[in-house]
Regions:
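NTP-handling and nucleic-acid-processing catalytic cores
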Residues: 3, 8-13, 49, 135-363, ...
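Glycine- and acidic
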Residues: 38-47, 119-124, 329-337, 379-383, ...
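Secondary-structure transition/capping motifs at alpha-helix termini
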Residues: 63-71, 91-97, 109, 113-117, ...
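Helix-rich, typically C-terminal accessory recognition domains appended to large enzymatic cores
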Residues: 79, 144-160, 250, 409-438, ...
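Alpha-helical recognition segments enriched in aromatics with Gly/Pro capping
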Residues: 309-315, 319-332, 361, 475-614
């Protein structure tokens, strides 16, 4: 058969679409499989090869599961709100809706050209009001349950995008969108109380099948620690200064305290502080730094002593100096820390820089050279002296703190509450109203969606306010509670809002009465397998798990965890081994590969290029190799034979069925394809194949290369569509070779290899070994004293 992919691929894509082969059926009697991929952000650049690899895993699994008789839900949609579109809209003076619609159309055509078996009837667009109505609905539920609050705080702010960023969106001190350095600014921020769900997010990991690396990233990000809250006081003032520590056993070693420069007690008692000018100057310098810069361990130690305030250590009554330093943040813990320089390296460095006392309370190191952070016997600690077990000394100190009313056991999380508002246009309007009489009031549910108003100017104000704040007809409204004059919230939600529940909407995408029907949720949820990028583990994955746990708690979904299994693909690097980027000139456009070699070649290559979970460089010669493989597959039509004589590759055929079946489930796609290549070579050695065996081969290859396999299947008279035909089964007995080759040793040295019947007894094996001419030459004139046979592995004859 001539492999004309430019005719074959559009032909079968149209046939599949016309027959609606990939549309999932609600409430089918078949077992269900819900396979999910991270829906794309529809950028103007269109699809890249990373999308192809990311979607190919679940694509192959979904096609295989359909052939195994499952009712498969494999949906797609678009995460369409976001800053890049809005920035482009500002640059080109084009409405974001127009840009988004064009980009989605482009993306959809590209995805279809690769032949992905998505259920297009369930496509969602997070920027459409019939979708974000329910995003707003979930937000209001969070608000009604006390999980939304507003606070004025230092925030991560991108001066280029003019937007507040969450910690997750500003990792490394850079804006996740434009990579500009983030600065700290005081702003009113809407937060979601994700920290209320920290424990559930941690314990929920015990109930899901995620790779250990993903679980550990989430555990580290949540950062749960156990310790104690301790009440220091300020000398001469009836003022409690609470700190949190994981090491209350070291309280006798505290020699100074450090506050965040923004700590409110500084302003409260500024009249007692003699160096406020210096403190304010230091604060100004801190404001120019990102949170990332402030908290780096490897940097010069900066700080300033507060002249006029001293803290009192509650366990020994000693007065200690109070400093401000940039590395202490108001958003972590209580905004103040106790410092034990003998046993914490950062405190030790700070103490040396500022000439502060260092008191040893744990024996074991030389604190004149560095902090000792190991275990040892407690000293200089009164009632803890002699303790040599950290757990016991912590427990004893915590007990005493509670007895004296100067502290208590506690838990802290590194994860912060989720900064949820953005001062931009292209996002979901936050459905809240500010009333001077009633305070903050939610928009009535029956008035949802609160639609984005039409605007001509999308640029955020120089005051950092949203473009919506300039639209009086949107801002001015009536309070839903008292009927008096009020003003709408003008910030919008972050891009992560719509993606926090999209997997639920796929279950019932056209429902206008609820975000999804509960019976459909019970049928489809949880997601059986979710594949996505490692870069989303501490953002989207945590956010969506949080929303889902909340919806479960209020009875709106049927499972606490949304995803039963999660996997991640490795990155496709440029041919130079570097990350693909336009500046390096190493970007590969997947449609160039489709146009030059065909979609099936691209599909096979991205899964054959290496371990699925690892990064791998693009290799043009390997792409050509995959095309040659498919050319040889097409050539099988030329050696179809009616000869009923057994073929030499029958055992290999059954082995291949088993291997491909198992390897797909294990995401070992490269070895599955390699097994098909090996089988193909053996078929060509025999130079004949029956229609029955060819059909088996085509079925195994179909999830990887569905177009060419459908074409050949039709050509040989196959009934219906190969893509929904039954997956082949192997005969376990036929996966065992009739003969095996084993090495023959004489006195422990390998002298030959012989072929023996698989599963034969010792006598048969020994007879075959002794009949070998080379072995016989080493036995001649010798006395056999021992014969050893390890079935299927080795024969050893001991002589003297």
């Amino acid at each position: 058969m001539k492999y004309d992919f430019k005719k074959i691929e559009p032909k079968w894509q149209k046939k599949w679409e016309d027959e609606r082969l990939f549309e999932a059926k609600d409430f089918s009697d078949k077992p269900k499989f819900y396979g999910l991929v991270e829906f794309p952000y529809p950028s103007g650049a269109g699809m890249h090869v990373g999308h192809i690899k990311a979607y190919s895993s679940m694509e192959v699994l979904s096609r295989k599961r359909r052939m195994q008789g499952y009712n498969v839900l494999f949906p797609i949609g678009y995460d369409a709100f976001g800053l890049p579109t809005e920035n482009y809209a500002i640059k080109t003076n084009t409405h974001p809706r127009v840009i988004t619609d064009a980009n989605i159309a482009k993306f959809s055509n590209q995805l279809k050209s690769v032949g992905f078996s998505f259920d297009w009837s369930r496509t969602v667009d997070t920027s459409k009001d019939d979708y974000y109505k329910w995003t707003q609905w979930i937000f209001l539920k969070l608000f009604d349950h006390g999980l939304v609050f507003r606070d004025k705080t230092l925030v991560n702010y991108c001066p280029h995008c003019k937007v507040v960023l969450s910690n997750e969106d500003s990792q490394g001190g850079k804006c996740d969108i434009c990579h500009t350095d983030v600065i700290q600014l005081p702003k009113d921020v809407w937060y979601l109380k994700i920290t209320d769900y920290a424990d559930k997010l941690l314990t929920g990991l015990d109930d899901v099948d995620y790779p250990e690396a993903i679980k550990q990233q989430e555990v580290n990000w949540i950062g749960k620690s156990t310790g104690a809250f301790v009440n220091f006081t300020i000398d001469g003032i009836d003022e409690k200064l609470e700190i949190y520590t994981t090491r209350p056993d070291t309280l006798f070693g505290v020699t100074f305290m450090v506050m965040a420069p923004e700590h409110p007690l500084i302003d409260k008692y500024q009249d007692r502080i003699s160096n406020m000018d210096a403190i304010n100057a230091y604060r100004d310098e801190c404001a120019k730094k990102t949170e990332f810069e402030r908290t780096q361990l490897v940097k010069d130690k900066t700080g300033l002593k507060i002249e006029g305030l001293e803290a009192v250590n509650p366990v020994n009554g000693k007065k200690i100096p109070i400093f401000i330093a940039d590395y202490v943040m108001m958003g972590y813990g209580t905004g103040a820390i106790m410092a034990v320089p003998a046993h914490d390296q950062r405190d030790w460095d700070f103490a040396h820089a500022f000439g502060i006392d260092i008191i040893e309370v744990i024996q074991g190191g030389d604190i004149s050279k560095e902090a000792y952070t190991g275990d040892g016997m407690m000293v200089n600690s009164e009632y803890l002296n002699g303790f040599d077990n950290k757990k016991d000394s912590i427990a004893k100190m915590t007990e005493i703190l509670e007895e004296k009313g100067i502290g208590h056991a506690g838990i802290q999380f590194k994860m912060k509450d989720w900064a949820f508002n953005r001062q931009r246009y292209w996002g979901e309007p936050i459905p809240l109203v500010h009333c001077p009489k009633c305070g903050v009031v939610g928009v009535p549910y029956e008035e949802l969606p609160l639609r984005l108003p039409e605007v001509k100017d999308f640029e955020p104000g120089e005051d950092g306010k949203s473009p919506l704040a300039r639209i009086e007809s949107f801002v001015n409204c009536t309070c839903p509670k008292c009927g008096g004059p009020a003003q709408r919230e003008t910030d919008t939600m972050p891009q992560w809002a719509g993606s926090s529940w999209y997997f639920l909407r796929y279950c019932d995408p056209h429902n206008d009465k609820a975000f999804a029907d509960m019976d459909k949720l019970k049928y489809w949820m949880p997601v059986d397998w979710y594949n996505g990028g490692m870069e989303h583990v501490t953002r989207h994955l945590i956010y969506s798990r949080f929303w889902h746990h909340f919806l479960y708690d209020i009875g709106e979904v049927n499972t606490p965890e949304p995803y039963m299994k999660r996997s991640a693909q490795g990155m496709i690097l440029g041919s130079d081994g570097e990350k693909m980027s336009k500046s390096r000139g190493n970007v590969v456009d997947p449609l160039d590969i489709v146009n030059q070699y065909g979609a099936d070649t691209l599909r096979v290559y991205v899964l054959f290029m290496g371990d699925y979970g690892s990064a791998a460089p693009w290799n043009d010669s390997s792409v050509k190799g995959c095309r040659r493989f498919l050319d040889r597959v097409a050539g099988l039509t030329d050696i179809i034979s009616d000869d009923k004589k057994a073929v030499s590759y029958e055992t290999l055929l059954h082995k291949t069925i088993k291997k491909v079946t198992d390897d797909i489930e294990a995401q070992k796609f490269n070895t599955a394809i390699a097994a098909l290549m090996t089988l193909l070579n053996e078929i060509y050695k025999e130079n004949r194949i029956s229609k029955e065996n060819l059909t088996i081969f085509l079925k195994l290859l179909s999830p990887f290369a569905p177009h060419i396999t459908e074409e050949i299947y039709e050509m040989i008279g196959g009934e219906g569509f190969l893509t929904v035909s039954a997956w082949p089964e192997y005969d376990e007995a036929k996966t065992i070779d009739a003969t095996v080759e084993v090495g023959v040793q004489v006195n422990g040295k390998v002298r030959a290899a012989v072929s023996i019947p698989a599963g034969c007894d010792k006598d048969t094996a020994m007879a075959a070994a002794k009949a070998n001419d080379r072995v016989a030459s080493f036995l001649e004139g010798k006395k056999i004293v021992k014969e050893i046979f390890v079935p299927g592995k080795i024969i050893n004859i001991v002589v003297k």
